[in-house]
Amino acid sequence: MPTKTIKIMVEGGSAKPGPPLGPTLSQLGLNVQEVVKKINDVTAQFKGMSVPVTIEIDSSTKKYDIKVGVPTTTSLLLKAINAQEPSGDPAHKKIGNLDLEQIADIAIKKKPQLSAKTLTAAIKSLLGTARSIGITVEGKDPKDVIKEIDQGKYNDLLTNYEQKWNEAEG
């Protein structure tokens, strides 16, 4: 049974039957509207965020399976502050603030996609992304929060989230 895999990025709940998805699906003999509706149903919870979607199609039976990944780190951070797009000038124009608990929650959601081996490393990675798109954390530049993590200021908070990190898939 030959299978074909299609990987695309869609806005949660808003996949469209146009190119490049529609023509690819119709070439494989699938009902484009049906597949797009199913993609929109399974990605609806990520409305407004870019979500990776993988469609595995059995060429002989025309059966397909849709797998939804975790939205991009940038999408999750922007959603957390209710912003539509990153700052065009992150060094001078800040677009929102998150607390470290929110960063830890996002790190746990992203664990399967992150190369970080520890929660602390994952949080530091997310802090770097937050800084690059104009988000402050705990009211400060994320670079300063990284220094405070290294100094042990957030050890209690990190310890509280370690169990969730260890239980998360990845």
Swiss-Prot record:
GO biological process, one term: translation
One cellular-component annotation, GO: large ribosomal subunit
Annotated SMART domains: RL11
GO molecular function annotations of the record: large ribosomal subunit rRNA binding; structural constituent of ribosome
Keyword set, alphabetical order: Ribonucleoprotein, Ribosomal protein, RNA-binding, rRNA-binding
UniProt xrefs under InterPro entries: Ribosomal_uL11 (IPR000911), Ribosomal_uL11_C (IPR020783), Ribosomal_uL11_C_sf (IPR036769), Ribosomal_uL11_CS (IPR020785), Ribosomal_uL11_N (IPR020784), Ribosomal_uL11_N_sf (IPR036796)
CDD domains in alphabetical order: Ribosomal_L11 (cd00349)
SUPFAM superfamilies: Ribosomal L11/L12e N-terminal domain (SSF54747), Ribosomal protein L11, C-terminal domain (SSF46906)
Functional summary from the UniProt entry: Forms part of the ribosomal stalk which helps the ribosome interact with GTP-bound translation factors.
Subunit structure, as described in the record: Part of the ribosomal stalk of the 50S ribosomal subunit. Interacts with L10 and the large rRNA to form the base of the stalk. L10 forms an elongated spine to which L12 dimers bind in a sequential fashion forming a multimeric L10(L12)X complex.
Family the entry assigns: Belongs to the universal ribosomal protein uL11 family.
Protein name as annotated: Large ribosomal subunit protein uL11
Taxonomic source organism: Sulfolobus acidocaldarius (strain ATCC 33909 / DSM 639 / JCM 8929 / NBRC 15157 / NCIMB 11770)
Lineage: Archaea, Thermoproteota, Thermoprotei, Sulfolobales, Sulfolobaceae
